[in-house]
Amino acid sequence: MKELALPSASQRRWQDMELGMFCHFGMNTFTGKEWGEGTEPASCFNPTAFDADQWARIAKRAGFSYLILTAKHHDGFCLWPTATTDYSVRSSPWRGGQGDVVGETARACEAYGIGFGVYLSPWDRHEPCYSEQEAYDHFYAEQLTELLTGYGPLVEVWFDGAGSEGRTYDWKRMMSLVERYQPDAMRFNMGIPTIRWVGNEDGIAPYPCWNTAESARVSLFTKNMLTWLPETPRWVPAECDVPIREQSWFWRPNEEEKLLSHERLIEIYYGSVGRGCNLLLNLAPDARGLIPEADAGAAIRMMDDIRNRFEAPLETIAGGGDAMTMTFARATRVDHVVLMEDIAYGERIRSYALEAETADGGWMELLRGSAVGHKKIDRFEPVETSALRLRILKREAEPHIRLFSAYCTARDDLNPRI
């Protein structure tokens, strides 16, 4: 049998989370920029109604499993009272310089049972020592250590490649810190990653999107691929990040018309989670420090629709082998199938066919697919059938099917299927 890449227990837990909420919040929230210069005065930061509880409450209500906060974006402004620089909440008027956005968000997530993770931009447009590689590596390692030791447990540490094209960092040092202080946290895309960037900011994964990879794109601004360190595991699943407002990661006033449509958000779910990836949907808090009602409402409507579609399977089976047949007590209308491999055994299926039993006892092919991995959601025109059959056409080893479920979403109580 071919030796297959296998996920760690931490990777499997992360993949089971499936849905994360990104919160881009910081200096840019008050300046109207996407990328700050690092010259904006700390006095600009003053979210007078800041409420991390509201963020976590929305995440919980919508059904997100984890929340990632931009602890430091490219402008270098830190949302925690770091000892490494004066360019932080400590120098802002907010809470008289005594506030800690990261700390309050971590506690709110814990209170609501939401996993917490941090984004820490390697590129720093404010820090004077950035041009000196050794000095900045030490500076960045200190910031990373503060976050890893002060705000855990963390489910993910997000390393953004934007602005770092061609720049070398001491990733071995940074990765060793994560492994030491937060061994179960996922490491995003850089150094020795345990998860990777899908390669776009549309929330849509290519298909097939295999869980094994040898590299990933650095950023949207170059086609160059990252050189990961040799210790990188072969199993590196993808995460799809996308803002709920078209091409706007940070909040700006009077841009509600940029909110993605409900139909687009549903399609993003099918193109991310439905292709075996995690979805990280950005809801940016506003200058008050609150997630706008319109943004929260759009996310909640999306997630409620998803739950309505998939909370009540017509039938579910599991097992192994090259063929599995699901039978119904009577002819049943079906338009969706969800497949999951037991990825503890690796990604074994390379191609498959789904068939429906016909009235004369024969079989009609509905579709063919390739990657299954953690999850594959297949949509098709509604059929009336007494049985569905999954046939494995190509595989690396005997498949272990964790879940084979059938659904009918073409119901009057659901939004029209897109």
Predicted regions and their residues:
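Short, conserved beta-strand segments of beta-strand-rich sandwich/propeller modules, principally
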Residues: A387-R389
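Mature catalytic domains of secreted/periplasmic carbohydrate-active enzymes
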Residues: M1-P382, R391-I418
